[in-house]
């Protein structure tokens, strides 16, 4: 019997925005019957890079990089996957307070916040960047704050002109950071009707000593790593808007100004030496944590889950399956690590002077972010 213990008492469908990943990731989910063939999605064929250029509404175009990505609504994705959970399997508002293995590790006993003790053959931790499972499987792992927050929001086609964003993920670049803006299908249960929704998000520096203030919500509650949509204080949104008004083109600023509710996510990173121990394993951000700008979050989470299924199905024992799977995940992480570092360097920490880039410099910069990709520059 499968049981899912979700520590949040609220429905997680409201805790996300858009999901973007290579098109083959979603095709693979359809092939595994995790998503229906007609699941709402939008196609992205280019990554478009722009910068502020005076009063030009959409800024100056720096170049396009050919892509094959798909975007979906987080709310719809959650509802579809949640729908497939067996009846009675999902339990909201329950935390894991402790674990204990028997001598031969044939099962794990889990203690919940309700005082119950339950035994399982396998426990999969998917509990995010502050994972209890990581503390057990990889004790001493350093969770590092990167000095950035990701401020994001959603705005529907009924609220703003977003059709001009069609087919692209627009990266708005400025000194010390960048933003990403792209279309997703409007959630089926969206409060504001519209065929599509624009998701925007910007990386902004926030010193560690002021992070706790930024993460304190409208009710005075301090959050650990994120402030949910609709709970970001007005003084924080005003400060962020004023900062971006000097950095991004007017059109993209107007999307922010018309967005009713926003959320904040603090950016962390962590690396784990192993993904499994005994009958315990880590998936998603419970394992290695990459910043979202690496583009690996969805790819990593889905890859963790599907490969875990395949490894366990192919192995003679759970232990053998977990051992093979853990090694596979480590190899994948080693391949993704330089990608995350390269993107962070070129889009956060060492962004060149965009006002004086020659065509050759632009090509070199975009090639460093997207090695081997087809790049189109202005005038080409």
Feature names for model-found ranges:
Residues 1-8, 124-125, 200, 257-342:
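Conserved mid-domain beta->alpha element of the FAD-binding
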Residues 8-87, 93, 97, 346-347:
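Active-site-adjacent segment of FAD-dependent monooxygenases/related oxidoreductases
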Residues 11-12, 132-133, 289-291:
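Catalytic P-loop NTPase motifs of RecA-like helicase/translocase cores
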Residues 15-16, 32-33, 136-137, 294, ...:
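Short, flexible helix/strand-to-coil boundary loops that buttress conserved ligand/catalytic motifs
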Residues 37-40, 55-56, 246, 250-254, ...:
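C-terminal helical "tail/cap" subdomain of flavin- and related membrane-associated enzymes
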Residues 68, 79-243:
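Conserved FAD-binding catalytic core of PHBH/FMO-like flavoproteins
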Residues 214-277, 281-283:
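Flexible internal linker/loop segments at domain or repeat junctions
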């Amino acid at each position: 019997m499968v049981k899912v213990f979700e520590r949040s008492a609220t429905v997680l469908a409201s805790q996300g925005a858009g999901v973007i990943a290579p098109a083959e990731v979603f095709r693979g989910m359809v092939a595994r019957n995790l998503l229906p063939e007609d699941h709402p999605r939008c196609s992205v064929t280019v990554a478009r890079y722009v910068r502020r250029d005076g009063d030009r509404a959409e800024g100056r175009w720096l170049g396009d990089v050919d892509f094959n990505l798909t975007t979906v609504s987080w709310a719809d994705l959650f509802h579809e996957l949640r729908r497939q959970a067996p009846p009675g399997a999902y339990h909201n508002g329950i935390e894991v307070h402790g674990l204990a293995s028997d001598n031969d590790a044939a099962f794990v006993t889990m203690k919940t916040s309700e005082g119950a003790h339950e035994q399982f053959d396998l426990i999969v931790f998917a509990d995010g960047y502050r994972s209890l499972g990581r503390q057990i499987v990889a004790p001493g792992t350093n969770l590092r704050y990167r000095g950035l927050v990701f401020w994001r929001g959603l705005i529907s086609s009924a609220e703003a002109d977003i059709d001009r964003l069609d087919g692209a993920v627009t990266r708005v670049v400025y000194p010390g950071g960048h933003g990403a803006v792209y279309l997703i299908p409007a959630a089926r249960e969206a409060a504001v009707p519209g065929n599509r929704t624009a998701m925007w998000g910007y990386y902004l520096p926030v010193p560690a000593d002021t992070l706790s203030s930024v993460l304190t919500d409208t009710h005075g509650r301090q959050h650990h790593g994120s402030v949910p949509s609709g709970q970001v204080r007005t003084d924080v949104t005003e400060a962020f808007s004023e900062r971006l008004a000097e950095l991004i083109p007017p059109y993209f600023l107007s999307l922010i100004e018309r967005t009713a509710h926003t959320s904040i996510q603090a950016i962390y990173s962590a690396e784990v030496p192993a993904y499994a121990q005994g009958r315990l394993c880590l998936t998603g951000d419970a394992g290695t944590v990459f910043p979202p700008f690496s583009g690996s979050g969805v790819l990593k989470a889905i890859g963790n889950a599907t490969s875990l299924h395949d490894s366990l199905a192919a192995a003679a024992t759970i232990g053998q399956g977990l051992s093979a799977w853990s090694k596979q995940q480590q190899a994948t992480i080693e391949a993704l690590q330089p990608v995350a570092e390269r993107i962070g360097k070129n889009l956060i920490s060492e962004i060149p002077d965009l006002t004086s880039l020659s065509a050759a410099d632009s090509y070199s910069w975009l090639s460093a972010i997207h090695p081997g990709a087809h790049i189109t520059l202005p005038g080409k």
